[in-house]
Amino acid sequence: MAAKVDLGKSPAEAPFKHWPIKGPEVSVEYRDDGCILLRSKHAVGPEPRSIAHLFVTQASTFPERPFLNQRLAGRGPWRSITYGEALRAARGIAQYLIERNLSAEDGVMVLSSNSIEHALVALGCYLSGVPVIPISPAFSLLTGDHGRLRHCFNATRPRIIFAQSGSTFAGALATLRDLDATLTFVTAQDHGPDSLVLDALIETEPTGAVASALERVGPNTVAKYLFTSGSTGMPKAVPQTHGMMTALVAGLEGLNLPESEDPSVVRRTLEWMPWSHISAGNVGFNGVIASGGTVFLDDGKPMPGLFEITMRNLREVQPVVFGSAPIAFGMLAAAMENDVELRQAFFKNMQYMAYGGATLSNDIYDRLQALAVLETGQRIPLTTMYGATETQGISMTHWVTERVGLIGLPLPGLVMKLVPNGSKLEVRVKGATVMPGYLGDPEKTAAAFDQEGFYKLGDAVRFVDDKDPTQGLVFDGRVVEDFKLDSGTWVSVGVLRPAIVAACSPNVLDAIITGQDQPFVGALLWPSAAALEQFRHSDGGPAHEALKAAIRANLAQYNATAKGSSRRIERFAILREPPSFAIGEMTDKGYVNQRLALECRASAVASLYQNPPPADVVIVQ
């Protein structure tokens, strides 16, 4: 097993670092139909008219403060743009869009990943009232037929296409050119013969038309279209109004204590998660603007060969806040257990950490806190926000807790409804952060809401303590991922997966849970890089056999205390190929799409249930 840090004493004895935020206060209404309604007792904070207005205010307040930082090509030094510079550039882009007669009925599609230029295009759209449409770069780069790119284009029909590099996105640009010959293409570098240079848009002299356009931007103005992950079909286009986004800003502001605003501390973050999704594109991006913070764009990812870049950036940035998917925290814990300098840099300024997209395992949480105590003498608050593309963030763990797996309590201004669904409680929500409906799809819109207008998220939750709702809600699995064994016993994938990862830590990075209509639960496991390295140098037999033996021992120990067939892992196999970004097994938010992974690994799944099993399948017992 890979080495762990020896603290000498339990980190649970250490205090938490002070986190100036209001604690949990919730009103609970129990209805005769079995539904439970939850509301925060905290009032919402001040709400800006739009994100565009908010950015103008912050740029006027902090004109010289760095807003965005990005490395120059070739892992060079950081280049930076201030709030004031970003506003001047965005106004130029807005003027160009106005001169081209673009309106709220049109759009600017962004094909490429996070960049300073991407942000400027988005802000220019906000100021002019033209929707921006950021899509996953994978739709352009990792699929040969560009099926999802075509789908997103046809759903929104933008008039302008932006890509960071004309050469990198040449294939996607050609596909779109064939779809619509009237499109305007804009690139920041490696320009093609028929593309405009973004600098030309930025240098457009703004007139009073920009201010007039901003006056027309309000809560009901569509700021952007985001696409769902498409785990159950083609991605759906979700309008993101300014009111949806500012309602989230106001809800979060309602939780801040007066002492939260320390002018000497600038919220400095390192961001790799994509702006084509809610977490980074709305919660993170708008949150940084609201706090007057500074973003460093991370060109690394939680993938072998790329996480080393993230570690280098963490050493330099020394962030105040760090948020990511659980997979990144697992890799980070393993790295810091063997790298003192990284640990020192990571915790030097850290005020709190945040995770989302999937459940963090208890083991990773314990290891992170052990490292924090070793470095600072304190535990660091770790929060999570729960929501969806259709809802923004709707709940948050806004208090210090020693548990993981919580989704917190509803944010101020929202109503959460818990609906009995078998033995579970299904989550639904109503409020200003929720979408008005899918673009051009009234049937899916109607199916997404119940008769009272609550959006149905498809997840299940339970109270930490039924007698004390202020302890919050625990994620209890995704209803659409749960399945039955052939005995009729339900298996909760969202609960079981992190439990298995924790039981096998640090040998396993992630897991696919199997067993629908089968006699037992199985698992396909991705080994961690640390485990592969450790067992490559192990004594005795081949490294792969030693790793299988170690994981078998982990699972045997786990099974000894697991209650019932729905919690036990009877067989497993180790996956040699990492989850694929190209086909969507691994989303660009950094979590595994269980449904798609099961389809893509169908032969491996089937092998778990062969009798006798093949050599690569391990029986735990």
Describe these PLM feature segments.
Residues 2-19, 127-201:
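Structural core segment of the AMP-binding/adenylate-forming
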Residues 43, 64, 68-120, 140-150, ...:
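Conserved AMP-binding/adenylate-forming core of the ANL superfamily
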Residues 63-66, 185-188, 192-193, 200-227, ...:
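Conserved pre-ATP/AMP-binding loop-to-beta segment of ANL
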Residues 79-84, 214-216, 223-250:
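Conserved AMP-binding A3 loop
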Residues 87-93, 204-208, 219, 238-261:
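Conserved structural elements of the adenylate-forming
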